[in-house]
């Protein structure tokens, strides 16, 4: 059994709107295979606004 790890940081705010849905897709061609997402991490930061009164 072969195991692969994919790790990539993508600056999504350059490509997608503020609200999105994320999904996964995988294929092996004509052969059957089971794909499992064993962990998932998502981090989001909103740019804050500051005001001085």
Curated annotation (Swiss-Prot):
Keywords: Lectin, Mannose-binding. InterPro entries: ConA-like_dom_sf, Lectin_LegA_CS, Legume_lectin_dom. One of its GO terms (molecular function) is D-mannose binding. The keyword Ion transport does not apply. It comes from the Eukaryota. Belongs to the leguminous lectin family. Tetramer of two alpha and two beta chains. This is Mannose/glucose-specific lectin alpha 1 chain. It comes from Lathyrus ochrus.
């Amino acid at each position: 059994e072969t195991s692969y790890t994919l790790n990539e940081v993508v600056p999504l705010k350059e490509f997608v709107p503020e609200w999105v849905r994320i999904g996964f897709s995988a294929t092996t061609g004509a052969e059957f295979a089971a794909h499992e997402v064993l962990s998932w991490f998502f981090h989001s930061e909103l740019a804050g606004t500051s005001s001085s009164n």
